[in-house]
Regions:
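Conserved HGGG/HGGXW glycine-rich cap/lid loop of the alpha/beta-hydrolase fold
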Residues: 1-44
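Conserved acidic catalytic loop of the alpha/beta-hydrolase fold
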Residues: 49-67
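Gly/Ala-rich beta-loop-alpha elbow adjacent to hydrolase catalytic centers
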Residues: 71-75, 79
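Flexible "cap/lid" loop of the alpha/beta hydrolase fold
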Residues: 84-85, 90-124
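Conserved alpha/beta-hydrolase catalytic His-Asp/Glu region
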Residues: 104-109, 123-185
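Short beta-strand/loop motif that positions the catalytic acidic residue
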Residues: 189, 195-197
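Conserved alpha/beta-hydrolase "acid-adjacent" motif
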Residues: 202-207
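Catalytic active-site module of serine/aspartate enzymes centered on a nucleophile-bearing elbow/loop
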Residues: 218-267
Length: 267
């Protein structure tokens, strides 16, 4: 099950679906606020808790007991917390580009940025907001590497509901807790987790190293010279890493971190 980021929708998983559907049943969906899914006008209908439950409700509706969950950015945040709340429903978690605004030094700036972007969607529409997002620092490498892919990403973003995007930004992105607030829960997590992040995704690098240290069943893959949308920038590398991870999990060989590997941590 693929869970998309704020700046995209189910269409941005196309290169993953083409690859993984050869061996797996693949499910993509648009989050609430992203047509053709419903776009509630009530702000209370948005937020990270709703997004976590939406994954579970989708699975229940499709009569799926458990699945591999793959999320990017906002979708990765929901996927990670899904693993905390619905442990038995997750075979594994692929958590890509998670954690913008999670570090203490980023909290205030991320909150302000999220609300400013929400205002752009409301006052100037999705086309203007899409221009801002697609030209942000974490998207530049996609533009540099794959101009056609970047233009497609921008076009899809321009098509999003300005109301749904604004409310998602205000109620989910701006108000979600820092991942560091869930430290105790992460330390108890036993689900296999692959953390994936680009080394030029500045707002996510540190928090992914932090998560690696908290989640004893996690592995961390850092993709060089890569920004935020790691699955779009480096689809072949991303698919390969995820394929290897899923294969290892299904063979029962994705094990907890060996305690011996941290004995020198205080040197």
């Amino acid at each position: 099950i693929f869970v998309h980021e704020f700046g995209s929708d189910l269409r941005e998983w196309e290169q993953q679906v083409r690859h993984f559907s050869r061996e797996y049943k693949c499910i993509t969906f648009n989050a609430r606020g992203y047509p053709p899914s419903e776009v509630p006008e009530d702000a209370k209908q948005y937020g990270y808790k709703h997004s976590v439950d939406d994954i579970a409700n989708l699975m229940k509706e499709l009569k799926i007991n458990n699945a591999h969950i793959i999320g990017l950015s906002m979708g990765a945040y929901a996927a990670l917390l899904f693993g905390l709340k619905y442990k038995k429903m997750a075979k594994s978690l692929v958590i890509a580009g998670v954690g913008s605004g999670a570090m203490p030094q980023h909290r205030k700036g991320f909150f302000s940025m999220a609300n400013e972007l929400a205002d752009e969607f409301i006052k100037k529409g999705s086309k203007k907001a899409a221009s801002i997002i697609s030209n942000s620092g974490s998207r530049i490498q996609l533009k540099n590497k794959d101009l056609r892919g970047w233009l497609e990403f921008k076009k899809h973003l321009e098509e999003h509901s300005n109301i749904g995007s604004a409310l998602t930004m205000q109620q989910y992105q701006a108000l979600r807790p820092s991942l560091m607030d869930f430290e105790n829960e992460f330390k108890r997590m036993n689900i296999p987790v692959l953390l994936a992040v680009g080394d030029e995704d500045e707002l996510c690098l540190e928090i992914n190293i932090y998560l690696k240290r908290q989640i004893k069943t996690s592995g961390l893959w850092i993709c060089s010279r890569t920004g935020h949308a790691i699955n779009l920038e480096e689809p072949a590398a991303f698919n390969r890493e995820v394929q290897n991870f899923l294969s290892t999990v299904e063979r029962g060989n994705w094990l907890k971190r060996d305690k011996e590997s941290i004995k020198d941590i205080n040197i």
